Design a protein with these regions (language model features):
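Active-site region of the double-stranded beta-helix
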Residues: 1-90, 110-147
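Histidine-centered metal-chelating micro-motifs
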Residues: 92-105, 122-123
Length: 147
């Protein structure tokens, strides 16, 4: 079984040319709208060109693409295979990224819009949760890519 998990949406109503989706995430206590206006990478590479990642200690992410597409790179040392590349579009469902997982995303050429129906834990501080970690300075993270 894969360590990468999705929460699927549920269609609860359809009319001519209209589909209503229930995209609820029961665990969620926060919602963020993340807009890439072009082919952005978040977080961007550092000043020497090394990949950077976010890692949350007090937040789980539940990312759903609502427009465009994103490629997520995930690194979690506790997984059987620590490194995953996930292609996410409007049909995949919600990608669950547990706290303690290094992650970054890249949009397609036209950008993308993601809703993150996050679960934030006591102690959450956006200044601490969104600090990029570089492969150039974190040897354990670097070693995931050179093996």
């Amino acid at each position: 079984m894969s360590d990468v998990h999705y929460k699927k949406h549920r269609v609860f109503r359809e009319t001519e040319d209209v589909i209503f989706y229930d995209i609820s995430v029961e665990e969620s206590n926060a919602s963020d709208l993340v807009v890439h206006t072009g082919p952005a990478t978040s977080p961007p590479d550092d000043s020497v060109g090394a990949k950077q990642f976010y890692i949350h200690s007090f937040q789980d992410d539940y990312n759903r693409v609502v427009s465009g597409e994103r490629i997520f790179e995930l690194v979690n040392y506790s997984w059987k295979y620590p490194y995953h590349i996930v292609h996410l579009n409007v049909h995949n469902g919600t990608l669950f990224i547990p706290r303690g997982t290094f992650h970054r995303s890249q949009s397609g050429k036209d950008g993308s819009i993601v809703i993150n129906q996050a679960k934030r834990y006591e102690g959450f501080n956006p200044d601490a949760e969104f600090y990029p970690v570089s492969c150039a300075t974190n040897m354990e993270l670097y070693n995931v890519f050179v093996k």
